[in-house]
Regions:
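Conserved short alpha-helical segments that host acidic/polar catalytic motifs at enzyme active sites
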Residues: 1-203, 208-267, 273, 361
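Flexible loop/turn segments at secondary-structure boundaries
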Residues: 65-66, 96, 168-169, 190-191, ...
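Generic beta-strand/beta-sheet core signal
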Residues: 89, 154, 162-163, 174, ...
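Secondary-structure transition/capping motifs at alpha-helix termini
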Residues: 109, 130, 264-268, 286-293, ...
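A conserved beta-strand->alpha-helix junction
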Residues: 113, 118-121, 292-303, 400-418
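Phosphate/diphosphate-binding loops
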Residues: 140, 188-189, 196-197, 204-205, ...
Length: 454
């Protein structure tokens, strides 16, 4: 069972690179390993062989949006309580985490982490003490949670999967040839472990997997408008995944085709920034008739810069990660496609790489609108202060990053990426589906003693 979880984590490594963990359930006895690092750094062959065979497992690769990058914040989180035990893995971000944690602490709760996942674990545990089953406890807990959460919860006898009522973050499940059920954030992980995709877990749904098979419950949260994160299609998800019936690859190609119409330019070649800019670049090239060219070689052994903790690390990683191909770039007018500009740091260095390689012109096109507002639902941008589009015009940003021109995907065209208007685009327009918190920083539970109560 640990091997299956391990390969699934490998397929989802792009979603989080800070830490990872696996918990295996061997007839009610939990065995676990969690640590900071990539999947191949945390788990050796010997580590995997030490796990019992087990009947169930939960695994997680972390991209922190609440709480720092510490070993204590590694997931899955394990809890022992009066009625048993559980292991919990969570993707998303609770928008009412501060209020919930304050309430729990006033009631005597002692927290061992600074992540919002432990808050979920506490609330489920409280509910479990007064509930006939773990699924009833989770259902009760979900009525108190606000924001984004796709989670998997393992008890001694059951595996539960749940998605928040808005469906912010993806979650799906499949089945292997031997009858093993597999739940994952993306369908690409199902393919990686040989599981056939069954369906996406619906917003507000709890699925219960046990010895009797699988059953569904959606009677607890009420109907909410679907608000899937549009940034999943633009950046987070792997291109070979299908989320809520929409191909990520197709959505990105659509973005490129739209950009070719809304921001045309005379150029010799279209190039994409690896990896999430490539599909949009193919769409731009196909729609515009400008040839697509390979402009960069990517170092496969370094992580994604946008989701790496700390700005200083991001600056160092860009040049190590990407190298421009001079033969493709020299004396060319280039349309450069990337998925987003958040802080501007990465874009400036990428444009500079092309200039150093001899590019005549660099026209940057972005397959998303300007990032104007913080995200409270699982993207690590917690302040307008860090968003370049909040402080500069498009022309000024082009000058700052060194591009000859700059064009963003119009917000009005987002619906044409996925053929629906049922998405959250609050990071672009400030329209939040849920109440937003007063305290938003990622490290809000980690302040020094001298900084508290100010």
């Amino acid at each position: 069972m640990a091997d299956l979880a391990y390969y699934g984590l490998y397929a989802l490594q792009h979603r989080g690179q800070e830490s990872c963990g696996i918990v295996v359930n061997d007839d009610g006895v939990f065995a676990s390993r969690k640590d900071i690092g990539l999947v191949n750094e945390v788990f050796s062959r010997d580590d995997l062989m030490k796990f019992p065979q087990g009947r169930m497992a939960v695994a997680h690769a972390r991209y922190g949006t609440t709480g720092g990058n510490s070993r204590a914040n590694c997931q899955p989180i394990e809890v022992n309580h009066q009625k048993g035990k559980m292991a919990l893995a969570h993707n998303g971000n609770l928008s009412n985490a501060y209020e919930l944690r304050s309430e729990l602490e006033l009631g005597g709760a002692i927290f061992h982490t600074t992540s919002d996942t432990e808050i979920i674990a506490y609330i489920v545990t409280q509910a479990r003490l007064n509930s006939p089953s773990i699924e009833n406890a989770l259902s009760s807990a979900m009525s108190r949670l606000e924001g984004a959460y796709s989670l998997v919860l393992m008890s001694a006898a059951k595996l539960l999967a749940a998605r928040d009522p808005y469906g912010f973050r993806p979650l799906c499940y499949g089945k292997t040839l031997d009858g093993t059920y597999v739940v994952a954030s993306e369908s690409c992980a199902l393919s990686a472990v040989g599981a056939k995709f069954e369906r996406d877990i619906l917003p507000g749904e709890i699925l219960v997997f046990d010895e009797n098979g699988v059953r569904s419950n959606r009677d607890h949260c009420g109907e909410k408008p679907r608000r899937s994160c549009i940034f999943e299609y633009i950046y987070f998800a792997r291109p070979d995944s299908v989320i809520d019936g929409v191909s990520v690859h197709a959505a990105r190609r659509n973005a490129g085709a739209i950009l070719s119409k809304t921001h045309p330019v005379e150029a010799d070649v279209v190039m994409g920034v690896p990896d999430s800019g490539i599909d949009a670049a193919l769409g731009y090239a196909e729609a515009s008739g400008i040839p697509y060219g390979m402009g960069f070689i990517k170092n496969k052994y370094i992580g994604r810069t946008f989701i790496s903790p700390g700005q200083d690390k991001r600056i160092d990683q860009v040049r190590i990660k990407l190298s421009a191909i001079s033969e493709s770039v020299k004396d060319k007018r280039i349309v450069l496609i990337d998925d987003s500009i958040v802080r501007g740091t990465t874009s400036r260095q990428i444009v500079n790489l092309l200039r150093e390689a001899g590019a005549k012109e660099v026209h940057m096109r972005i397959s998303s609108p300007p990032f104007m507002h913080p995200c409270y639902y699982g993207t690590d941008v917690d302040s307008r202060e860090n968003l370049i589009a909040c402080h500069h015009s498009v022309e000024e940003i082009a000058d700052i990053i060194g591009a000859d021109s700059l064009g963003y995907l119009p917000e009005s065209e987002l619906k044409n990426l996925i053929g629906s208007e049922n998405f959250c685009s609050a990071c672009f327009n400030g329209v939040y589906p849920t109440p937003i918190p007063d305290v938003i920083t990622k490290d809000r539970f980690e302040g020094k003693l001298s900084e508290r109560n100010k």
